[in-house]
From Swiss-Prot:
Coiled coil: none annotated. GO terms for molecular function: ATP binding; metal ion binding; protein-exporting ATPase activity. InterPro entries: Helicase_ATP-bd, Helicase_C-like, P-loop_NTPase, SEC_C_motif, SecA, SecA_CS, SecA_DEAD, SecA_motor_DEAD. It is a peripheral membrane protein. This is Protein translocase subunit SecA.
Length: 833
């Protein structure tokens, strides 16, 4: 009650923020005559002057009115488009590092130019992040005209560019690109061997377009760079054959709400018999069990033409939020291979993670982050908790005129689709354009078939027909036009109403099913009623829809019975609509917890990732790695000598063991023969440094490159192995909950211990390699072409040719021979991994 009264008297927090910006808007408007008097050639000169002022210490906030007024005038001259006052407010919200919620058609692309130009004055670069390559190229070319008019440079990052092109794009004042490309470039930079090979130049300021899609919808999917592993693909086919013989509810159960499939006791016994093993859950059968469960999920939780399609003999993922195809992106953990076996297409080798990061942790690296979207308010809590971003609702330039009708709810899908087809036919006959939103390719094609039978001409826009996306969406507002679009395909392209359509009521949005997120529903509605245009929307639902069936059916079914529904008769009751909205809120809360849990686990990895990447950057850029090598050596010798320094005289066995480790790790027998007594730690240190000194004498100026090569080589090898071990730890850590232990704390504790061990293995590995080098002829170029990992998940990079390897003193070790380090493991599973 008190909160309501406070809001009534003082306005909401959002209202108070916008009110504070009004005097600045007035100041910008007051500068308009001054900017109108400038000649075209004066604009780049002004920008150069502002840049100089920033270098001299003037704050961006003090310059905001002048710069915004200059950009507004530039917009008028280049595009004949003047920024509205509400767009100035949106620009200020972005500059302040907030999320600007602006309705469809309010000109988000133009709004971004204001803070982009202001922040580009620092010379540290501004990144504008979009959801796909098409929008990145379109906006860079379109808004690039304005930036070039002002004397600012523009780059664009899209799939297929080489490192030189990427470096040039990042070197520009303003860089457009997709979230995937920015994230992968960061990971790839941290796999490079020379500082001059890096393409990114830091993370200063980013504006994320469609911020809800990128920071929330895609936050459950980490970016992963991977290389092929050695596992055979035959096992996937075998497990697929077994799963086809299982019977639901007898051999396994499926929980669609939790998206899990589990074997029953009878199913376990049946599978053990078919595979020919005694115990499926024996540690020795963990690989078989894993592939069996993935095959079970592939057959029972993933649907063709909903979660993926088969195109040109490949399984291609369909983005559940946008309906777009995601070529090059693969499900991890063997699931994609299980789907390939299910669809009887070629099975690609499973990949091993070489580098990964979540979008949450990538975007939190920016000194300042802002975002734009038409729908963010429903996720304001998550934006604040995860990213410390506030959502500001920007008023529309003209009042909203769209009418949102109550949901029409039917008992069965058949009744619902019949009603939809009839409604479309009536609207088409009246000449009112209709945009039909579906949540799967399957539904869009079913409706298309129904409309063909009734003779209603229409366009279909889904992942199978995405080539003409912009063209189809642009025509969607024409008189009598019917467009069926999967989810939010076509976001970013305005639907302009054709002649005479306003008089007919504008564009009508027809939703065929509620999405599990209210925000996605609001995005679909938001395609109508842009810039004060008339419009309308209605969702058609049935009790058989996934959301109703899984999350709200019992209560809603009870309401239906009380209201006495008959076949084919819809119900339009606010009570039912509220029950559906509550079901959506439950799903949103569930998904938020999933994303938060992912972040909690990735925060552990993020701390480790930062340490490793800092080590790599130091190794790449340090003019002299000598002090680092001495520090590594001290740590190694401290560990080697620990058994012999307990206070008492070491036994003969202890002395032999220490000599053995000195020989293995430091190759000390190259300059010192084993004796009954151990050398002091200082003597051992001097001996190892003498080996390195000899290497420096033999290699001259190439010494630093050789040290760096082996340091980065060992670091990458150990980090790759550590990522795999952390994946395995994460997979099994949930079981700790049964032992009354917090899985997250256990993961953090054990992960830290594993990380400490890995750091030590890096130090050992560097000395094991360097002390065995015998130089015949070392060319610096041999170290400048370090082989990059072959397969890049999501982005598909190609491998470069590898270098000629330096000659070693030891005889060549076969991959299946015992490792010479003395671990007792095969070379390919140990130092040769």
């Amino acid at each position: 009650m008190l909160g309501f009264l406070f809001k009534k008297v003082f306005g909401s927090k959002n209202d108070r923020y916008i009110k504070r910006l009004r005097p600045i808007v007035a100041a910008i408007n007051a500068l308009e005559p001054q900017m109108q008097s400038l000649r075209d050639e004066d604009f780049p000169v002004r920008i150069a002057e502002y840049r100089q002022q920033v270098e001299e210490g003037r704050k961006l906030d003090d310059m905001l009115p002048e710069v915004f007024a200059l950009v507004r005038e530039a917009g008028k001259r280049v595009f004949n488009m003047r920024h509205f006052d509400v767009q100035l407010v949106g620009g200020m919200a972005l500059h302040h590092g907030k999320i600007a919620e602006m309705k469809t058609g309010e000109g988000k692309t133009l709004v971004a130019t204001l803070p982009v130009v202001l922040n580009a004055l620092t010379g540290k670069g501004v990144h504008v992040v979009t959801v796909n390559d098409y929008l990145a190229k379109r906006d860079a070319a379109w808004m690039g005209q304005l930036y070039n008019f002002l004397g600012l440079s523009v780059g664009v990052i899209v799939h297929g560019l080489d490192d030189e092109q990427r470096k040039a794009a990042y070197g520009a004042d303003i860089t457009y690109g997709t979230n995937n490309e920015f994230g992968f470039d960061y990971l790839r930079d941290n796999m490079k061997f020379y500082a001059e090979q890096l393409v990114q130049r830091g993370h200063n300021f980013a504006i994320v377009d469609e911020v809800d899609s990128i920071l929330i919808d895609e936050a459950r999917t980490p970016l992963i760079i991977s290389g092929a592993s050695e596992e055979s693909t035959g096992l996937y086919r075998h497990m697929d054959e077994i799963v086809r013989k299982l019977t639901r509810d007898t051999h396994f159960t499926v929980d669609e709400k939790a998206r899990t499939a589990m074997l029953t006791d009878e199913g376990v016994a049946f599978c053990e018999k078919l595979v020919g093993i005694d115990n499926l859950y024996d540690p020795g059968n963990i690989t078989t069990q894993h592939h069996l469960m993935q095959a079970l999920k592939a057959h029972n939780l993933f649907r063709r033409d909903v979660d993926y399609i088969v195109k040109e003999g490949q399984v291609v993922i369909v983005d559940e939020f946008t309906g777009r195809l995601m070529p090059g992106r693969r499900f991890s953990d063997g699931l994609h291979q299980a789907l390939e076996a299910k669809e009887a297409v070629k099975i690609e080798a499973e990949n091993q993670t070489l580098a990964s990061i979540t979008f949450q942790n990538y975007f939190r690296m920016y000194a300042k982050l802002a975002g734009m979207t038409g729908t963010a308010d429903t996720e304001a809590v998550e934006f604040h908790q995860i990213y410390s971003l506030e959502v500001v609702s920007i008023p529309t330039n003209k009042p909203m005129q769209r009418k949102d009708f109550a949901d029409a709810i039917y008992r069965t899908k058949r009744e619902k689709y019949d009603a939809i087809a009839q409604a479309i036919a009536e609207l088409h006959k009246a000449g009112q354009p209709v945009l039909v939103g579906t949540i799967s390719i399957e539904t869009s094609e079913l409706l298309s078939t129904m409309l063909k039978k009734t003779g209603v001409p229409h366009s279909v826009l889904n992942a199978k027909h995405h080539e003409k996306e912009a063209e189809i969406v642009a025509l969607a507002g024409q008189r009598g036009h019917v467009t069926i679009a999967t989810n939010m395909a076509g976001r970013g392209t305005d639907i302009v109403l054709g002649e005479g359509v306003r008089e007919l009521g504008g564009l009508h949005i027809l939703g065929t099913e509620r999405h599990e997120s209210r925000r996605i529903d609001n995005q679909l509605r938001g395609r109508s009623g842009r810039q004060g245009d008339p419009g309308s929307s209605r969702f058609y639902l049935s009790l058989e829809d996934d959301l109703m069936r899984l999350f709200g059916s019992e209560r809603i079914s009870g309401l239906m019975e009380k209201l006495g529904m008959e076949e084919g008769e819809p119900i339009e009751a606010r009570m039912v609509s509220r029950a559906i909205e509550n079901a959506q809120k439950r799903v949103e809360g569930h998904n938020f917890e999933i994303r938060k849990t992912l972040l909690d686990y990735d925060n552990v990895m993020n701390q480790q990732r930062e340490v490793i990447y800092t080590l790599r950057r130091d190794a790449m850029s340090a003019p002299d790695l000598g002090p680092t090598m001495e520090e590594f050596l001290d740590d190694v010798l401290e560990d080697v000598y620990a058994p012999a320094e307990g206070g008492e005289a070491p036994s003969a066995d202890t002395v032999a063991a220490v000599w053995g480790r000195l020989a293995d790790v430091c190759n000390i027998t190259r300059v010192m023969q084993p004796a009954p007594a151990l050398p002091t730690r200082d003597e051992a240190r001097a001996a190892v440094l003498s080996i390195l000194h000899e290497l420096r004498e033999d290699t001259g100026e190439s010494y630093r490159d050789i040290i760096r090569y082996f340091m980065l080589e060992e670091l990458d090898r150990c980090w790759k192995e550590h990522l795999r071990n952390m994946d395995h730890l994460r997979d099994g850590i949930g079981l700790r909950g049964y032992g009354q232990r917090d899985p997250k704390l256990e993961y953090k504790r054990e992960g830290f211990a594993m990380f400490q061990e890995m750091l030590f293995r890096i130090k050992e590995g560097v000395f094991r390699s360097l002390t065995r080098l015998r130089v015949q002829r070392v060319e610096e170029e041999a170290f400048r072409h370090k082989e990059q990992p072959a397969a890049v998940a999501y982005s598909g990079g190609e491998a470069e040719a590898g270098p000629a390897q330096p000659h070693r003193e030891d005889p060549k070790v076969g991959r299946n021979d015992l490792c010479p380090c003395g671990s007792g493991r095969k070379y390919k599973k140990c130092c040769g991994a």
